[in-house]
């Protein structure tokens, strides 16, 4: 799925978010400008807050998982391990799935 950053609509709708995959995030990172690479994180963050406010916890968990993946694999900012750990733990608090547990183990190995 092609990811677009839209300042007029700075979050993903639930159906769009659920259509995103970790590969989509990696492809976006490879093709985007440095600014848009960072902006994607903030769009995901805004989406997470919006979903939690609407009590859409399974989708919020998926968003937190995508954030952990993006921080740990693609973006790798300073403290990426700690930040990714925070978001994968949040995903697991909201919806404990085998996929999130597997990623927790990967993240816990460090980068």
Where are these regions (language model features)?
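Helix-turn-helix repeat elements of alpha-solenoid scaffolds
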Residues: 32-47, 77-83
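Amphipathic alpha-helical repeat scaffolds of TPR domains
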Residues: 6-35, 56-73, 98-110
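A short acidic, glycine/proline-enriched capping/turn motif at secondary-structure boundaries
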Residues: 70, 75-77, 93
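TPR/TPR-like (Sel1-like) alpha-helical repeat modules
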Residues: 81-96, 105
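Long, ordered, amphipathic alpha-helical scaffolds
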Residues: 2-3
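Flexible helix-coil transition and linker loops at the boundaries of alpha-helical arrays
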Residues: 45-60, 91-100
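Generic alpha-helix detector with strongest preference for long hydrophobic helices that associate
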Residues: 25, 48-49, 56, 81, ...
């Amino acid at each position: 799925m092609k990811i677009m950053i839209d300042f007029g609509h700075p979050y993903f709708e639930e159906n769009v978010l659920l259509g995103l995959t970790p590969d989509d995030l990696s492809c976006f990172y490879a093709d985007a400008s440095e600014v848009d690479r960072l902006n994607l994180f903030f769009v995901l963050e805004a989406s997470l807050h919006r979903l939690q406010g609407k009590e859409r916890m399974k989708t919020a968990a998926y968003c937190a998982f995508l954030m952990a993946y993006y921080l740990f694999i693609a973006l790798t900012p300073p403290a990426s391990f700690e930040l990714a750990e925070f978001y994968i733990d949040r995903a697991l608090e909201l919806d404990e799935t085998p996929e999130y547990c597997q990623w927790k183990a990967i993240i816990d190995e460090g980068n």
